[in-house]
């Protein structure tokens, strides 16, 4: 079965696993998904993200979720730009999430980064998702 939006699938898997209290979650490997997972790790929303060898020689990404006082650290994980409607922003229009308390993950010409780093670098790009 083909997947129309693999990034949305990844975000939904993370949301579902966090809402039921699972310690980790796995999904099929792609470089974009790995970059998003590493951004989440760097920003402190998850403990770890690693590539593991899955079944039939296909790689998977495993994320170890982070909880604080029994509640998931990731409260909001929302896909913004999707396959049917892409959302692009210049460096001046990059959105702030919850007044700067959350992050937006941006795909730029310099790689996948958070909104504040994109502003510092002076680049815009496709707004992939919001995290808070």
UniProtKB/Swiss-Prot annotation:
Pfam families: Ribosomal_S8. Keywords: Ribonucleoprotein, Ribosomal protein, RNA-binding, rRNA-binding. One of its GO terms (cellular component) is ribonucleoprotein complex. Part of the 30S ribosomal subunit. Contacts proteins S5 and S12. The gene is rpsH. One of the primary rRNA binding proteins, it binds directly to 16S rRNA central domain where it helps coordinate assembly of the platform of the 30S subunit. This is Small ribosomal subunit protein uS8. It comes from the Bacteria. GO terms for molecular function: rRNA binding; structural constituent of ribosome. GO terms for biological process: translation. The keyword rRNA-binding applies. Belongs to the universal ribosomal protein uS8 family.
């Amino acid at each position: 079965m083909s997947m129309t939006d693999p990034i949305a699938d990844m975000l939904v898997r993370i949301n579902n696993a966090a809402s039921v209290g699972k310690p980790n979650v796995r999904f099929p490997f792609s470089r974009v998904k790995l970059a998003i997972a590493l951004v989440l790790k760097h920003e402190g929303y998850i403990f770890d993200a690693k590539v593991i060898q899955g079944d039939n020689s296909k790689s998977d990404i495993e994320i170890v979720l982070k909880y604080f006082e029994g509640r998931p650290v990731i409260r909001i994980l929302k896909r913004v730009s999707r396959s049917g409607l892409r959302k692009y922003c210049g460096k001046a229009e990059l959105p702030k999430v919850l007044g700067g308390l959350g992050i937006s993950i941006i795909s730029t010409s310099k790689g996948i980064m958070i909104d504040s780093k994109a502003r510092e670098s002076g680049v815009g790009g496709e707004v992939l998702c919001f995290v808070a």
